[in-house]
């Protein structure tokens, strides 16, 4: 039987003070990330703690290499790049997915992305710019709502009904006037996506940007991510959007799945 005290570390697992300290440290990091830098006084006000307490937390995080201080303002340190890269490459699919996303961008001329689902959200693991691509906010590491993106809906269509329900229960955030916010409408579309094999995003995440996404599954049939291509809606329309790009996308996705099978 395990004791509440870890015999190796001496840490008391039931000590609420230790948990609160950890939670507050992470809250500070989230505040600094959200606001792209914070002053100690802002941290103290946001967290309802004294100025001295805020300074202690900030100085400790600086000492540990997680924050840097510039002109009295605290920012996230580059250490997070190292941590993020390790987390990203922990996904075995990443290293080879990068190669196929590059192929997809080159063949389509569009911006391509590879995303995965984690904690009921989508995360961009890789993005590649084609010859005619535009910037679409698809930065590596960015978290996105699955229901508002082509790759996200492709993943959703491959998840269990229970997991889809949990994602819907979080709320279907409206990103544009075209975002699907009705659970019944989303479920109907997911059925179509399963039958068709790919998903469309018609200006549902960013006004003026369309996208097509397809799920990537492993040998057991479990979805491990999704590729997508995106571009301006005035270019991605008609047969190019509904037929040509889906065929390019499915071809490269199938090649990648074959590589997974043979590896």
Q: For each predicted feature, which ranges?
A:
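Sensor-regulatory modules in signal-transduction proteins
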Residues: 216-219
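Short regulatory alpha-helical segment in sensory/regulatory domains of signaling proteins that mediates
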Residues: 101-109, 113-116, 257
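Short hydrophobic alpha-helical segments used for membrane anchoring or interfacial signaling
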Residues: 113-119, 127-128
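Short, solvent-exposed recognition segments
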Residues: 136-205
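Conserved segment of winged-helix/HTH DNA-binding domains
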Residues: 79-108, 125-127, 132-137
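Juxtadomain coupling helices with adjacent low-complexity linkers
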Residues: 226-263
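N-terminal helix-turn-helix
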Residues: 2-94, 102, 254, 258-262
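Glycine-rich acetyl-CoA-binding "A-motif" of GNAT/NAT acetyltransferases
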Residues: 223
């Amino acid at each position: 039987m395990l004791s509440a005290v870890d015999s190796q570390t001496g840490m008391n697992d039931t000590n609420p003070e230790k948990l609160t300290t950890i939670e507050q440290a992470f809250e500070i990091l989230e505040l600094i990330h959200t606001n792209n830098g914070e002053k100690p006084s802002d941290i103290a006000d946001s967290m309802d703690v004294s100025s001295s307490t805020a300074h202690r937390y900030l100085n400790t995080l600086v000492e540990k290499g997680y924050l840097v201080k510039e002109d009295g303002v605290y920012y996230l340190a580059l250490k997070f790049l190292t941590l993020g890269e390790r987390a990203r490459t922990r996904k075995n699919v990443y290293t080879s997915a990068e190669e196929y996303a590059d192929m997809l961008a080159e063949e389509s001329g569009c911006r391509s992305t590879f995303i995965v689902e984690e904690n009921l959200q989508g995360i961009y693991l890789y993005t590649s710019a084609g010859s005619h691509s535009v910037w679409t906010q698809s930065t590596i590491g960015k978290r996105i709502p699955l229901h508002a993106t082509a790759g996200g809906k492709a993943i959703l269509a491959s998840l269990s009904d229970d997991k889809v329900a949990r994602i819907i229960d979080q709320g279907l955030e409206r990103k544009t006037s075209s975002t699907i916010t009705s659970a019944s409408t989303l479920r109907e579309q997911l059925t179509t996506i399963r039958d068709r094999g790919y998903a469309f995003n018609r200006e549902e995440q960013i006004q003026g940007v369309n996208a097509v996404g397809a799920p990537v599954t492993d040998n057991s049939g479990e979805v491990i991510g999704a590729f997508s291509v995106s571009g301006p809606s005035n270019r991605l329309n008609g047969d190019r959007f509904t037929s040509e790009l889906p065929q390019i996308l499915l071809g490269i996705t199938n090649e990648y799945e074959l590589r997974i099978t043979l590896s």
